[in-house]
């Protein structure tokens, strides 16, 4: 096949066999092929006729010896470096257009599989033979699977490349990653190959794929739900230092839906952690990975994925010796989508990404053309929006995106609205070949441009909110337009210099809430002084001196150097009797006490599930998110109060829950039932929920049922709780532990009070902030005692969240552990906007708890 076209590196069309053609575009390196170089040769000049002097002879001998040594060194370098071979492996697939897929191709031991695999290996060998820096170093290829389309062959190829050519070989394969061959290309009789795709992979993967001891193949049957698990699930852990894979198939013209029902692997933050990867092919090619998973997930987490064709590959690579049960998964086949998008012509309606709330498939494009009546305008409100891809900045949207009015949207976003200045709007959705997400749920609405939000306030973004949310100090509009040009309520709000209104209890809490820091101005102490959390000013020399000069311990918190100091009620005391200058040292992952006692008894405050579901603007807690939360039911009355689990035998609650009232003996432990691991009040018999009766109720002897001072109680269980993924204890803080003003903490409960209210079925959560004690006393004069703390509601995106009396305040501390800061006492349990709630300070009762429980 001659050609007059100039070629670089012999890169013109080459003829392989009976017509399979491959167009190489690669260049030689320095004009050398196959890395051949020559050793230097001595060029000895003839000596002059007159004999050399002794020194000349000696110099010649030395020079000759030096040249010999250089030659030997070069030879050693050549043998030890240039001839060192590096193993490189690529995996990929080849599309064969003149073959029809038969069922026998699913069995790697069938005659049909072996025959076609042999042809594929021959074709690969021919292709590589014409590629510089690859062909001479090709060792072997293996075919691992076939699938429809017409026939797709999945393979890996191994090369042994001289070390000095590795970089060039990788460049060559990177450039030729997608090889498009002429449609008429033929080799080996009528074997037609139209494309070859290859990607680099780990050589260990190839070695492991040759071991079929943990390799499984499953084919969907009709509409049946198929199940598979890791070896030994759930009674024994999956194998360590292993590679398992599951090749899933469906019928032609179908796609697969895969769901992980239970998922428990070693933590993601461990080096070389165990990893599950789902691929949209039958070969483990990174660019076709849909998701990578590690750690543990609650049952409610969305782990449903969809293929774009009739195959999926799931791999599990384990490196750790940790004992985890692994996963349980199901899959089924469903018809391939014939179209995506469409025309929407009603006045309002909804639409969503394919298979929402499951993950959308890769390689899909959808277009919705929306048209409302002529005299109206149209807007699209995205209620949920998750188009996030690992390592991809959300602002650029180079991969998956939604496009409206020429603007692309991607990443993870809270509710937002896009409007049109006409009665038409077009929404486009695109996903690429890798890493999918949940997608979106949207609604479109027609509106009158002169009154876009009848009876409501219109944000500049087009979103509608209730009128009473206007100028309440909370930014309900994402652009803060509901808080502009407001007149602040002097009794409840602070006027920022930028004219924003903020709750009074956020003033001087060391957090810049106004945005211009005006709520923190006038709170500072003079130069060379330190401002305590309670507002008191001290000389800087008194900070970190081992003494509680502030009175609230804030001058001794977060000191950089840990010193042994004189013991006070505000210093941490080790078991050996020594006290530390460091604030809150317990269970922070560092041994500060010389006897290590600050890191003992730390099996608490950690969730079993390392991943939590994503909820934007909601208050529903996830399953297992607060495993120490307890629901207390009074006989014949249902849920009444909350509590927290601190050990297998003991709960902490509020004393006011156990005051006899209306002829009912709330102080009688036999009248109560505790539900541990509960998430939904209507599912008290669900798996993972533990039901326990109470053996004893110990209310604090100083509890005052009029002022609610000393509002704390201890509850002993009749039968110990069993720790599980849904039931875990919370950490108790030391008596010296400080939860400073401005710190964000969480309150949880089902929103029920002792005297009424239906409450929520699903466990609720609310983020709150510790309020400066002086501010708290000013807001609630003559009502606050030193045993009480105030908090204010923090999450502006949610209207309110009612916690339960007796429930815990959960604070995330050092090392990610969660400590109980307080107990829900009185006021609004989760706090209302601009209204603080009051809670019992738990650190002040640490000694009392230990005296009565031993915990």
From Swiss-Prot:
Encoding gene (name): ST14
Annotated catalysed reactions: Cleaves various synthetic substrates with Arg or Lys at the P1 position and prefers small side-chain amino acids, such as Ala and Gly, at the P2 position
Extracellular side, ranges: 77-855
Enzyme class label: hydrolase
PANTHER family, A to Z: ACROSIN-RELATED (PTHR24252), SUPPRESSOR OF TUMORIGENICITY 14 PROTEIN HOMOLOG-RELATED (PTHR24252:SF17)
Name of the protein this chain belongs to: Suppressor of tumorigenicity 14 protein
Cytoplasmic face of the membrane: 1-55
Domain CUB, first and last residues per copy: 214-334, 340-447
Pfam family, one: CUB
Role of this protein: Exhibits trypsin-like activity as defined by cleavage of synthetic substrates with Arg or Lys as the P1 site. Involved in the terminal differentiation of keratinocytes through prostasin (PRSS8) activation and filaggrin (FLG) processing. Proteolytically cleaves and therefore activates TMPRSS13.
Domain LDL-receptor class A: 452-487, 487-524, 524-560, 566-603
Domain Peptidase S1: start-end pairs: 615-854
Membrane association type: Single-pass type II membrane protein
UniProt record similarity statement: Belongs to the peptidase S1 family.
Organism per entry: Homo sapiens
Glycosylation sites: 109, 302, 485, 772
Primary site of residence: membrane
Alphabetized GO MF terms: serine-type endopeptidase activity; serine-type peptidase activity
One of the protein's GO biological processes: proteolysis
Disulfide bond sites: 214-244, 340-366, 397-410, 453-464, 459-477, 471-486, 488-501, 496-514, 508-523, 525-537, 532-550, 544-559, 567-579, 574-593, 587-602, 641-657, 776-790, 801-830
Residue span(s) of domain SEA: 86-203
Family matches, as Gene3D superfamilies: Low-density Lipoprotein Receptor, SEA domain, Spermadhesin, CUB domain, Trypsin-like serine proteases
UniProt entry keywords in alphabetical sequence: Disease variant, Disulfide bond, Glycoprotein, Hydrolase, Hypotrichosis, Ichthyosis, Membrane, Protease, Repeat, Serine protease, Signal-anchor, Transmembrane, Transmembrane helix
